[in-house]
Amino acid sequence: MYTHGHVDHVFGTPVFDAENAELGRPRAKVLAHEEVDPRFDRYIATAGYNGVVNQRQFQLPAFQWPTDYRRPDVTYRDHLDVTVGDTRFELHHARGETDDATWVWVPDRKVLCPGDVIIWCAPNAGNPQKVQRFAKDWAVALRAMADLGAE
């Protein structure tokens, strides 16, 4: 499951795909918010620009923006319940750092997986070289997660 479409959250998938192929197992299904796929399209269209911006921001002069993405197999708009074994996962959409963020609640275990809806600084409203963030919606999502009583 992708918590959002930033490259640091989606580029580990090929390792799992390769292992499954090597072991003769089917490829795992990737779940994500419906805006992840359009994000990948934007990333491909702006790869040169994103490469330059990220080289400067992260001081990585050799960094090349990727153009090959493992697309989601299952997408959702507002909310999706998924059961794996006997565990139910509630996927919730939030706009915060990105417009395609997902946070996950595991109600039977009172476990919260916030993805990057919780990061080292909030709200991170963005910077002039990147897409603006969604500070008000982000605050609403943080309150919704806080109200769950995660343990």
Regions found by a protein language model. Name each.
Residues M1-H6, L31-H33, C113-G115, A150-E151:
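Active-site neighborhood of phospho(di)ester-bond hydrolases with catalytic His/Asp-centered motifs
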Residues M1-K29, T75:
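Active-site metal-binding motif and surrounding structural segment of the metallo-beta-lactamase
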Residues R27, L31, E35-E151, ...:
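Metallo-beta-lactamase
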